[in-house]
Amino acid sequence: MKDVKALKLMTLNDVLSQINGDMTLGIGTGSTMELLLPQMAQLIKERGYNITGVCTSNKIAFLAKELGIKICEINDVDHIDLAIDGADEVDPSLNIIKGGGGALFREKVIDEMASRFVVVVDETKIVQYLGETFKLPVEVDKFNWYQILRKIESYADIKVERRVNEDVAFITDNGNYILDCKLPKGIDPYKFHEYLIHLTGVFETGYFLDMADQVIVGTQEGVKILEK
């Protein structure tokens, strides 16, 4: 049986086939992108592509620069041709949860700008409903994070925790906190997102709804391509 890393690497050829010529490329954050990015950089170099990357986190921008990929800031581009990113969960409608790496706001900005948004996952990320195996991240202001937590818990039977890293509160690249929400089955993601996004102090949610154009899945049987 292949491990998760092997399943992710299986998707490599399908990911690389999306990259060509002159392109502004949105580069996602997380373990999948960190695994695939060196091969993407090698392809760009070998084929002489004129690729400019727009990165979703400081961490991935540092790695991309080290690999020789030309990087620019989001405000330096008018459009993004293709965004490639991982996901924490994908449901049957290709709605996804992202934000395990804490970069959900910047990921959403870049993925929404992209003409095409391709998601790369292994089969463990495919679920029947959002929240089945992964907590929904919500990026919030430090000032009133606890009041937001209480309001989220009052919405339904939701357990909410402020994210910590080695006993220290996790801070996003935007200087905010992350609240991780364990969702019960039956939560409507559209309604819950609307509730959250209208709470004062909520920066963004980890719901990426109706955004993915294609999901590339590494499975024990091979690569599966999911499209709407």
From Swiss-Prot:
List of catalytic residues: E107
tRNA-binding as UniProt keyword: no
HAMAP family: Rib_5P_isom_A
Stated name of the protein: Ribose-5-phosphate isomerase A
Keyword entries, A-Z: Isomerase
GO biological process: D-ribose metabolic process; pentose-phosphate shunt, non-oxidative branch
UniProt-recorded Gene Ontology molecular function terms: ribose-5-phosphate isomerase activity
Signal peptide per UniProt: none
EC class: isomerase
Assembly, per entry: Homodimer.
PANTHER family tied to this protein: RIBOSE-5-PHOSPHATE ISOMERASE
InterPro entries documented for this protein: NagB/RpiA_transferase-like, Ribose5P_isomerase_typA_subgr, Ribose5P_isomerase_type_A
Residues binding substrate, per UniProt: T29, G30, S31, T32, D85, G86, A87, D88, K98, G99, G100, G101, K125
UniProt keyword Isomerase present: yes
Its EC number(s): 5.3.1.6
Entry's family note: Belongs to the ribose 5-phosphate isomerase family.
The organism of origin for this protein: Staphylococcus aureus (strain COL)
CDD domains: RPI_A (cd01398)
GO terms for cellular component: cytosol
Purpose of the protein: Catalyzes the reversible conversion of ribose-5-phosphate to ribulose 5-phosphate.
Catalytic reaction(s) noted: aldehydo-D-ribose 5-phosphate = D-ribulose 5-phosphate
Pathway of action: Carbohydrate degradation; pentose phosphate pathway; D-ribose 5-phosphate from D-ribulose 5-phosphate (non-oxidative stage): step 1/1
